[in-house]
């Protein structure tokens, strides 16, 4: 049986806990139960990820070489997706400009769209 290969950009786990980390922890704690999907969880601090999701045959942890978001999005992630023959990738807020597979983009907070008067133009 061929497994679906799903890359998850987990860089948000490298910072302070927030709504995005709660969302990812919740959804992927359930999805990793599906053994027909192989998950590639990527972050700079993979030790933190392994404490959350544990070790299973269908999980691979990938350590980013940098915390720099520009280098990660422009170079590192596209290279990792190609190297691991990823079919789908899940990102938060921003996707790499060079898309090497189908992708899922989650935008968690869109208050700036409903109430632009409360946010600076640069937001």
Model-predicted segments: where are they?
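Carbohydrate transferase catalytic cores enriched for Leloir-type hexosyltransferases
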Residues: 1-123
């Amino acid at each position: 049986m061929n497994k679906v290969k799903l890359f998850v950009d987990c860089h948000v786990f490298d910072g302070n806990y927030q709504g995005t980390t709660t969302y990812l922890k919740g959804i992927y704690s359930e999805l990793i139960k599906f053994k027909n999907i192989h998950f590639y969880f990527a972050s700079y601090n993979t030790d933190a990820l392994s404490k959350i999701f544990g070790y299973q045959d269908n999980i691979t942890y990938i350590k980013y070489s940098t915390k720099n978001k520009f280098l990660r999005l422009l170079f590192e992630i596209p290279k990792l997706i190609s190297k691991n023959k990823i079919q789908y990738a899940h990102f938060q807020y921003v996707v790499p400009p060079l898309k090497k597979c189908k992708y899922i983009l989650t935008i968690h907070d869109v208050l700036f769209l409903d109430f632009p008067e409360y946010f600076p133009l640069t937001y």
